[in-house]
Amino acid sequence: MNIYVEANPYLHDKYSKYADEKYKREGNPFVSFPIHFDDIPSGAKTLALTFIDHDAIPVCGFSWIHWTAANIPAYIGELPEHASEERQDLMIQGQNSFASPLAGSNDPKVIHQYCGPTPPDKDHAYTLTVYALDAELNLQPGFYLNELYQEMKEHILAETSIELLARV
C-alpha cells in the first residue's frame, strides 16, 4: 500500500502554521491536506489514519494527535483537500489532542477534526499512518486514539507511514 501527500519537503502552508487566518480556527489550521492511496490490498473494506507529532514530546510531554479518522472507503483512491470538514460522509473522526484538558478547547470543529501543525520550537516531523482494514470499525464520532487501536487490532491487512515536515 502506498500513500502520497504533496510536500516539498514541507507540508504546504495552507495546512499548517502559516495558513491564512481564514483557514484557522482558535488559531489553528483546519483545512486538511489531500491524501492519495494506491495498491490497497484486496480484501480491504476500509482505511483508517492517524496524524501524530512525536516531536511534541519535549514541548508538552506527549505525542500530539492532530487527526484520527476511520471507516474511509478502501476504494476511494484519494481523500480530497478539506475532507475533514467538507466530506465527513467519507469517514468518522476521533478526538485530537486539543480535546485534552491541558489544551482546553471544547469546540467540536477543533477537537473532532483535522487540526494542522503549528510547531512552536523547531521544525517538526509529523507521522501520517494509513491502515488498510478488512472491516468497518465499531467506533463513534469523537473516539479516542486508543479505541481506534483496539478496534483495528485483528483487522489490519496493511499499514504504511510517511513523515511530513512543518516549519516553525
From Swiss-Prot:
InterPro entries: PEBP, PEBP-like_sf, YbhB_YbcL/LppC-like. CDD domains: PEBP_bact_arch. PANTHER family: PEBP (PHOSPHATIDYLETHANOLAMINE-BINDING PROTEIN) FAMILY PROTEIN (PTHR30289:SF1), UNCHARACTERIZED PROTEIN YBCL-RELATED (PTHR30289). NCBIfam families: YbhB/YbcL family Raf kinase inhibitor-like protein. This is Uncharacterized protein YxkA. The gene is yxkA.
